């Protein structure tokens, strides 16, 4: 994880220094739209699985979320997800679908458990290729945020990649898991229409404070699957729609086979969650779909260029 984080930092610095023009050439709207859409749609089975574990609670959470967004404006409307999740949690408690034993056993104060990382050079070649997929996913997230907010955040792409790398490196040194940009957060932004970075500064500070209270962590871990299923149906769906919005805004012409294939193949790979295993490393639908979008687009363009040159050589 540390090596992946360092690689992301290097890529982020290069992008920040060199600029993002080459990214626009490598990731045109049809590619970024496909990547963003497949990120959201790839997570649909997770929403379905959670929903089926508590359909009543999930349905109530989903209906309350949609109703609150439709009926209320201002602060209440922006907190629709929070209110719906809390209401679903309370209903699950009433129905006895929440295991409170871990909450009762957890202390009020305590430090998180840190682990000392072990470095194994043999596994580095397996992890570093994942950087390609992470870069594509991260850039797709940045573009979706820009599309959603109507702001040109492309110049910040390098910083986003570097920050992701720094966070992953620090997490690796502490024995934690890799960090990345999350589609769920983009879905929350789309649903609440709160785009201020100040909200994330505050959220980060609050999260650090709450991490010192194991009881809070246990309560969050005990959130019933039904509640998560109801909420993520909306959140994941919104991320998928953002990808489609990128196509519409940039007037992607789907009469062209190039654009058809670039969108169709990655979407199927992502939605079906294709997997490819190399030793102990597993590439899932999002990573494979992102790579497929790049390979299909640039591969077909290369073949089209070669086709145009062949008659000239023959002449």
Predicted features by range, described:
Residues 203-206:
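N-terminal glycine-/lysine-enriched basic segments
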Residues 100-113, 147-150, 160, 299-315:
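Intrinsically disordered, low-complexity non-transmembrane regions of multi-pass membrane transporters
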Residues 4, 124-129, 167-171, 226-229:
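Short alpha-helical transmembrane interface motifs in multi-pass membrane proteins
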Residues 2-99, 209-311:
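Membrane-embedded alpha-helical modules
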Residues 57-61, 79-80, 95, 112-141, ...:
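Hydrophobic, membrane-embedded alpha-helices of multi-pass small-molecule transporters
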Residues 128-197, 313:
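Membrane-embedded helical hairpins/re-entrant loop segments and their flanking transmembrane helices
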Residues 29-32, 56, 115-124, 153-160, ...:
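Membrane-interfacial loop-to-helix junctions in multi-pass transporters
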Residues 63-68, 79, 99-104, 132-149, ...:
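Juxtamembrane interface elements at the cytosolic ends of transmembrane helices
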